[in-house]
Curated annotation (Swiss-Prot):
It is an enzyme of class 2 (transferase). This is Hexokinase. Pathway: Carbohydrate metabolism; hexose metabolism; Carbohydrate degradation; glycolysis; D-glyceraldehyde 3-phosphate and glycerone phosphate from D-glucose: step 1/4. ATP binds at K111. Residues 21-465 form the Hexokinase domain. Residues 209-454 are annotated as: Hexokinase large subdomain. Disulfide bonds: none annotated.
Length: 478
């Protein structure tokens, strides 16, 4: 059996002595399918680099590589009061960020629940609601008033095209929103008009993507940070490139911007390998793709993001039942329901601390109505390990590709998201994957994944501060 990454303590895993030979044979085949060798990781990384380059070209590619129009590095010395908002699927988050100027900041925040009808409301109602929430927040936090307009950074996690940091044309609503009169329009002046109508002393100076916010917030507090990452229900990465390396910017930036100027890039690399050239897809991955709302899209995301981990496990278990190898004479109706096993299920399976895997037993009884045997639970545990390990190892190919592309020999890669933060063993498996790609000889890894700062709040505020400084210095925003 091939074991990659950290091994669970032996007393938790138990032995496979009671597992029938026919099941062990099947498990060995599945280990071969789901195990990603160091050599394969290196090949994927090389292909990843070429797709990153293609995304920056005039012709474009699978990976969008969207310029974020943040053209300065945070120094950590930025100071002042800044506001940030994040429009999520169910809440509006308003954050006051006080930048301390010594790579430090304090935040105060409030959440406002979106009214039930807001997702399908009229455009004016959405902006009026946000302006009203901002007014309440400012009146509460600045009871003596403010001397000048508060700069605001707007985290807008919906597909938008930008030609500068202070504009964003909504391409299409996602996350269940369907508000008329917004798609195809610049959201910044719409929000600004609603704010001015209420005479709230706020100026919207920056519209940002959440992963770009994670990058900038982490660079503010950590001078070694080179990348912002997200690993949760989706996956993404952001980093700084230079204008000269981005052919598709030709003719879109003023002549007085130096070719060596930095430019934040929001990769959206969940779309890596949409052409299915390099990723080691199994028949289970192919089935997930074919039955998804957008077949052929987000190939990388479908193999590594938390949204799909439980579904891979479900499909493998269904396959084993079709061969009459497990769950004999059981009611499988619930197991046949797509996505009935969310990301928490393989995570909880891996976390079961008991040698007899009694937590797994209860889990399958509770969620699927299936009684499991001891050998079946051991197979289920091993499958969860393999799926989690594959996700972690594949996910770092994006990190490795960006580091190689930019020539980073050392880097802190700041990661956020539920899979990174909560999935058992993910950090250790990802670190092992990076070692397998770079084959370092040093005792300490020069490129490491670290917890990210709050990109939705602090990141948006710091970008607002950088934008405000550019305006004061008379520098162009495009």
């Amino acid at each position: 059996m091939v074991h990659l990454g950290p091994k669970p303590p032996q007393h938790r895993k138990g032995s496979f002595l009671d597992v029938p030979e026919y099941l062990l044979k099947e498990l060995t085949e599945l280990e071969g399918l789901l195990t990603v060798s160091g050599e394969t990781l290196r090949k994927i990384t090389d292909h990843f680099i070429s797709e990153l380059e293609k995304g920056l070209s005039k012709q474009g590619g699978n990976i969008p590589m969207i310029p974020g129009w943040v053209m300065d590095f945070p120094t950590g010395k930025e100071m002042g009061d800044y506001l940030a908002i994040d429009l999520g699927g169910t809440n509006l988050r308003v954050v006051l960020v006080k930048l301390g100027g010594n790579r430090d900041f304090d935040t105060t925040q409030s959440k406002f629940a979106l009214p039930e009808n807001m997702r399908t409301a009229k455009s004016e109602e959405l902006w009026e609601f946000i302006a009203e929430c901002l007014q309440k927040f400012v009146e509460e936090e600045f009871r003596n008033g403010v001397l000048s307009n508060l700069p605001l950074g707007f985290t807008f996690s919906y597909p938008a095209s930008q030609g500068s940091i202070n504009e964003g044309y909504l391409q299409r609503w996602t996350k269940g929103f369907d508000i008329e009169g917004v798609e195809g329009h610049d959201v910044v002046p719409m929000l600004q008009a609603a704010i001015e109508k209420r005479k709230v002393p706020i100026e919207v100076v920056a519209l940002i993507n959440d992963t770009t916010g994670t990058l900038v917030a982490s660079m503010y507090t950590d001078p070694e940070a080179k990348m912002g990452l997200f690993s949760g229900t989706g996956c993404n990465g952001a980093y700084y490139d230079v204008v000269d390396n981005i052919p598709k910017l030709e003719g879109k930036v003023p002549d007085d911007i130096k070719s060596s100027s930095p430019m934040a890039i929001n990769c959206e690399y969940g779309a890596f390998d949409n052409e299915h050239i390099i990723l080691p897809r199994t028949k289970y991955d192919i089935q997930i793709d074919e039955e998804s709302p957008r077949p052929g899209q987000q190939a990388f995301e479908k193999m590594i993001s938390g949204y799909y981990l439980g579904e891979v496990l479900r499909l493998i278990l269904l396959d084993l039942t079709s061969k009459q190898l497990i769950f004999k004479d059981q009611d499988l109706s619930k197991l046949q329901v797509p996505f009935i096993l969310d990301t928490s299920i393989p995570a909880r399976i891996e976390e079961d601390p008991f040698e007899n895997l009694s937590d797994v037993q209860e889990l399958f009884q509770e969620i699927l109505g299936i009684q499991t045997t001891s050998p079946e639970r051991k197979i289920i545990r091993r499958l969860a390990e393999l799926i989690g390990e594959r996700s972690a190892r594949l996910s770092i190919c994006g990190i490795a590709a960006i580091c190689k592309k930019r020539g980073y020999k050392t880097a802190h890669c700041a990661a956020d998201g539920s899979v990174y933060n909560k999935y058992p063993g993910f950090k250790e498996r990802a670190a092992k994957g990076l070692r397998d790609i770079f084959q370092w000889e040093s005792e300490e890894d020069p490129i490491v994944i670290v917890p990210a700062e709050d990109g939705l709040g602090a990141g948006a505020a710091i970008i607002a501060a950088l934008t405000e400084k550019r305006l004061k210095d008379g520098l162009p925003l495009v």
